[in-house]
Amino acid sequence: MKYSELAEVYTDVAATSATTQKETLLADCFLDVYDNTETSLLPVTVRLVRGRVFARWEAAEIGVSTAGAADAISKATGVESEQIETWWREEGDLGDAAAYAVDDRVQQTLTATPLTVTRVYETLREVASYEGSGSQQKQRDEIAGLISDASPLAARYIVRTVTGSMRLGVGEGIVRNALASAFLDMSDDAADAVQRAIDLTNDVAVVAQRVAEQGQPGLDDVDLELFRPIKPMLAKQAESIQTAVDELAADPKHIERNHNIELSHSGAVLIEFKYDGIRAKIHRDGDDIRVYTRRLSDVTEQFPDVVSAARDHIDAKHYIIEAELVGYDPQSNDDTPVTFQTLAQRIQRTDNVATIAKSIPVTTYVFDLLALNGESLLTDTLEMRLERLNTILSTKATSDSKSASTHNAHSSTSVTTVSSDQYQSSSSLRRAQCTWATTQTTAAEFYEDALAAGHEGVMIKNPARPYQPGSRVGYQRKIKPTMEPLDLVVTRAKWSEGRKSDFLGRPYLACRTADGNLAEVGRMHTGFTDDQLETFTNRVEPLIENVEGREATLTPAVVLAVEYEEIQISSTYDSGYALRFPRLKQIRHDCDPSQADSLERVERLYEQQSLDESQTSV
């Protein structure tokens, strides 16, 4: 299949704003590819439509900056870099600049190699593998080779794929529905089956292949796999402790009637400390243990102490466990955790791992078990999963778990050290502190304990529900002090002035909308330290899509945790809301835009804020 044919589909999809029309166009494309090309091309096409050449769980990226892509365009076409930058600035899209350059190319390719979908895909995957001296030049040469053989339209989408900005308006939901329409009956059940398979594989290409070849039975067979991480189940914000306890307490009659389950804690909720750390999944298969973040990044090398703790204090050889990695200051005399920003240094550093592990030791707080000895536990109730979890944790690891009759957060302070000499003084693994509660009083006391121990708040969970990866579910709630921070996506930033003129700052902040787009809710003017400003600039500079004056439009990829005074109604931003005095809490290295807070949540916080104000004034 010629890449230009796929580029034409891209153009048609980008031209319509109607979701159903996008789904129809993609469904037709997927069917045509499956019926008229080699079978292996369907998963490649589906992945490229999402602007990717790797699955989310693969630890790889194309890794070419916009500047590198611009150099490749110039090399392929002979057009001066200054002209390419002019087009880029005028159009706000380096892909458009590539199309203009190919159309206006100075040098012509005499013996062009056919530009197929397979060639583009395999070349971009190869580009990501280059390392060491001269790797950047090799990357640019390979991309220039693709552009040299491309039409203007094909060049536009090659460059957009390289820079991670397809501009198709196609999210995971549209691809899901297109697959359900193409290969199933497009009922709600069909779309749900495709979504379940995507959640369990984190690879839409694998799902496409299965549903095309095997239909519904192929999706039903999809299950958890070791070393293929899944997205976490997320909790909704609770209006109050009382509301959460009332709504989530397991109704024994409902459970027995609808699920044939007997609960040991009928009418109760599970309450856990909410830790401000790195959410992680620990996979073990025999001697091989891997650690993954909520963004599915493999951070095993950065956390050898976590690996050692898991090996020594989890009595099983095949499992997937979920935990929170919480950092501590070894020089401190208490267990107050370090900030997430400090802990995040451990993800960012891949050198001197032993040194930084000792300077920022972590405790691994285990709170869920998703698979054990080859058996997926996702459909089991939370209570059943925790019972299985307790059977494989060492005595010391479970000693920190809270009983329903104990609420002093400092009463269990034993530290479980690992056997490895290198990390013996700094590693621990504990069961997340938790209790069962049937009343608001019990829950409120435990919440105060969590805050007193320096943690974020509490999680309140219905014990009778399964694990649903990738979803923000209503049967788990989080409670933190108000106004709690929002996780927001950076869409624009401005070059600073004076001594900080080399840095980008003052970012515009956006939340997710129901249709998968972004809506801005404010702009941050303060809150960066010099170190944070440098880190922020290094993170967003490769994401620049367009520059007007001192303002840069960015590919939405960076998420910030933002604190603020209040939420106001505003016509300044397209969300209809504005944050008053937003300030940086931390750069969320562990969070991607799909996990940012929603406009619905901003609206709910505004309504709750208004209600609180009216009650205060009475």
Curated annotation (Swiss-Prot):
- This chain belongs to the protein called DNA ligase 1
Q: What EC number(s) has UniProt assigned to this enzyme?
A: 6.5.1.1
Q: Name one GO molecular function term.
A: DNA ligase (ATP) activity
In which family does this protein belong, per the annotation?
Answer: Belongs to the ATP-dependent DNA ligase family.
Q: Which GO terms describe its biological process?
A: cell division; DNA biosynthetic process; DNA recombination; DNA repair; lagging strand elongation
| Top-level lineage group | Archaea
Instruction: Show the Pfam families listed in the entry.
Output: DNA_ligase_A_C, DNA_ligase_A_M, DNA_ligase_A_N
Catalytic residues of the enzyme: K274
Q: Where does the chain bind ATP?
A: E272, R279, R294, E324, F367, R472, K478
Please give the cofactor(s) recorded in the UniProt entry for this protein: Mg(2+)
Catalytic activity annotation: ATP + (deoxyribonucleotide)n-3'-hydroxyl + 5'-phospho-(deoxyribonucleotide)m = (deoxyribonucleotide)n+m + AMP + diphosphate
Q: What does this protein do?
A: DNA ligase that seals nicks in double-stranded DNA during DNA replication, DNA recombination and DNA repair.
Tell me which species this is from.
Haloquadratum walsbyi (strain DSM 16790 / HBSQ001)
Q: What InterPro entries does the annotation carry?
A: ATP-dep_DNA_ligase, DNA_ligae_ATP-dep_bac/arc, DNA_ligase_ATP-dep, DNA_ligase_ATP-dep_C, DNA_ligase_ATP-dep_cent, DNA_ligase_ATP-dep_CS, DNA_ligase_ATP-dep_N, DNA_ligase_N_sf
* Keyword annotations: ATP-binding, Cell cycle, Cell division, DNA damage, DNA recombination, DNA repair, DNA replication, Ligase, Magnesium, Metal-binding, Nucleotide-binding
Query: Which stretches does the entry tag as region Disordered?
Result: 396-422
